[in-house]
A protein has these predicted regions:
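Beta-strand-rich domain onsets/edges
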Residues: 1-27, 42-44, 50
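Conserved, single-site charged/polar hotspot
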Residues: 2-8, 29-31, 51, 57-63, ...
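Short, surface-exposed loop/turn motifs at beta-strand boundaries within globular domains
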Residues: 10-12, 25-27, 45, 79-81, ...
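Broad gene-expression machinery/nucleic-acid interaction feature
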Residues: 14, 83-85, 110
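Short, ordered, surface-exposed loop/turn motifs in non-cytosolic proteins
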Residues: 22-47, 54, 347, 351
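Short, acidic Ser/Thr/Gly-rich low-complexity loop/linker segments typical of extracellular
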Residues: 40-72
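A short, solvent-exposed loop/turn motif at the edges and junctions
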Residues: 67-99
Length: 380
């Protein structure tokens, strides 16, 4: 039985939890408990107890949310989504506690959880940061939308490609933060769910997803951070890149858009690289010649199409292009062959990538990332 939220007007949103193991295989009979965040009024009592089916999925449950108009009105100051906490328990695996899962009205929220084998009595606690349109984050530092790739020492890819994985540095570039290997589509879905509301018009979601993907592919194509001496693709800092939140839920409307257009990006005539399409909320921060997130919502509600929204902000010479799809994490030649006897950071990076694949495809032996190219690495 659902417990009513302590708010006035209410709408309803939906939540489904998907549970897999480290090899991405579904886990059946996982125990999933949903509760409201603990307050003085609400002592964190469970409102739903569920179990996953053979596909590792719970049934879809209805949950209370704020009114729909909160997420469609840029002048609204109230939080437009509801927060819930989720606990996932599976015998032999670490317990997962995910706090502040976001539920929007008239939207299906998807919480994907990958369980890890238990070592002792470990528990992983994940706190999802607030949405960028509700909380305040550092403003984007402006950059040129087309990077000069002809400077001495600069290395770029030979073509525009869709990587299988991106490496996300969870902080500012120079911070001592953790790096995460994330599939490209999962990264885009995470960022879009963190940067815009899933309740917005379809054309608005598509326009924003295109801007997010083009920005990301510019970082991939120019090897922006690699050329600065880093071994990651992009950061989670809004001052430098885009907001990515470890462990957060995504939304079905965004999930479907990304699956349909994930191989697209934004181009200008006679420019090979994807355009670094910068954007801002358009409310707390204004950004001439960048996409305004709230402004794009208003245009979508007026009936503007995806490309019309894009060109309204970036100009009439912006068009949609399609990239190739490749496996792994694209990188240019490091200056030496990676073969028996080679060593160093690039060998270690390759070993880490091989080990990431081996964790999913269990027929492939695991490899130790020691930075030395030996026979064990050659056999993979």
């Amino acid at each position: 039985m659902l417990i009513k939220m302590q708010v006035g007007e209410q709408d309803r949103g939906e939540l489904q939890v998907n549970v897999t193991d480290s090899d991405n295989a579904p886990i059946r009979d996982a125990r999933v408990t949903i509760s409201e965040p603990e307050t003085a009024i609400n002592p964190n009592s469970p409102i739903e107890r569920l179990e996953t089916d053979v596909s590792g999925q719970t049934q879809i449950v209805d949950l209370n949310t704020p009114p729909l108009e909160y997420s469609l009105n840029e002048n609204n100051e109230n939080m437009p989504y509801a927060n819930y906490n989720i606990q996932i328990e599976v015998p032999g695996y670490e317990t997962e506690n995910i706090r502040n899962v976001e539920i929007l009205p008239d939207s299906l929220s998807l919480q994907n959880v990958r369980m890890r084998k238990r070592e002792g009595e470990q528990v992983e606690n994940i706190d999802i940061d607030p949405h960028t349109l509700y909380a305040e984050y550092p403003e984007k530092i402006p950059e040129d939308e087309i990077k000069d790739v002809n400077e001495p020492g600069e290395i770029v890819l030979s073509r525009v490609v869709i990587p299988e994985y991106v490496v996300v540095h969870d902080g500012t570039p120079s911070s001592n933060a953790r790096d995460y290997y994330v599939t490209y589509k999962d990264y885009i879905k995470n960022v879009a769910s963190s940067e815009i509301y899933a309740t917005w018009p379809r054309a608005t979601i598509e326009a924003n997803v295109l801007a997010i993907m083009s920005f990301t592919l510019n970082r991939v194509y120019t090897e922006w951070y690699r050329n600065k001496g880093y071994d990651f693709t992009i950061t989670s800092s809004t001052a430098y890149d885009q907001k990515w939140i470890y462990g957060r839920n995504i939304f079905q409307s965004i999930d479907e858009v990304v699956d349909e257009i994930f191989d697209q990006y934004l181009s200008r005539p006679d420019v090979r690289q994807p355009i670094l399409t910068q954007y801002c909320d358009g409310k707390r921060v204004t950004c001439p010649n960048w996409l305004s997130q709230w402004g794009s919502c208003n245009l979508g509600e007026q009936g503007f199409g995806t490309l019309e929204i894009i060109r309204n902000y970036y100009g009439d010479d912006m068009y949609i292009n399609t990239a190739e799809q490749i496996s792994g994490i694209p990188a240019s030649w490091p200056g030496y062959d990676l073969t028996i006897g080679a060593s160093g950071q690039k060998v270690m990076q390759m070993q880490e990538q091989l080990d990431t694949i081996a964790r999913v495809y269990t027929a492939i032996p695991r490899v130790s990332a020691d930075g030395v190219f030996g026979e064990g690495t050659q056999l993979r």
